[in-house]
Amino acid sequence: VLSSTDKSNVKAAWDKVGGNVGEYGAEALERMFLSFPTTKTYFPHFDLAHGSSQVKAHGKKVGDALTNAVGHIDDLPGALSALSDLHAYKLRVDPVNFKLLSHCLLVTLASHLPSDFTPAVHASLDKFLASVSTVLTSKYR
């Protein structure tokens, strides 16, 4: 459960991300594909090369979905319901992949926002991404 401090930390950190949301999302995807090659199997139709327009476009989708989640931090299930349906019923993404992408997002944010990425902010973002992952996998059960 996200505390009020966690929510404040997440919102403040996401404000710092700002207009870089698509870039950071794409970078996190690239990190995931390089670090966890099995995740590539969900994107057989993508050009997964560095700087690929398809990875950039999907990175923006990821970033925009997280921006929506931050904006609806008190109702993540409502905000992410359609995305949960898509990933569970149509795409059938293995739930572990959300954890892998979350880790890569944390690494990406830490590399771009080092002075803002305090232990408290790190913990809050980790809890937030875990909450998002839980919602996205809730319809698998």
Curated annotation (Swiss-Prot):
> What InterPro entries does the entry give?
Globin, Globin-like_sf, Globin/Proto, Hemoglobin_a-typ, Hemoglobin_oxygen_transport, Hemoglobin_pi
N6-acetyllysine-modified residues are 16
**The keyword Secreted belongs to this UniProt entry's keyword annotation:** no
Which SUPFAM superfamilies does this one have? Globin-like
GO MF term list: haptoglobin binding; heme binding; iron ion binding; organic acid binding; oxygen binding; oxygen carrier activity; peroxidase activity
Per its UniProt entry, which superkingdom is the organism in?
A: Eukaryota
| Chain positions found as N6-succinyllysine | 7, 11, 16, 40
Q: Which residues carry this modification: Phosphothreonine?
A: 108, 134, 137
Q: Which residues bind heme b?
A: 87
Can you supply a Gene Ontology BP term from the record? hydrogen peroxide catabolic process
Q: Which CDD domains match?
A: Hb-alpha-like
Q: Return the protein name.
A: Hemoglobin subunit alpha
Gene name in the database record: HBA
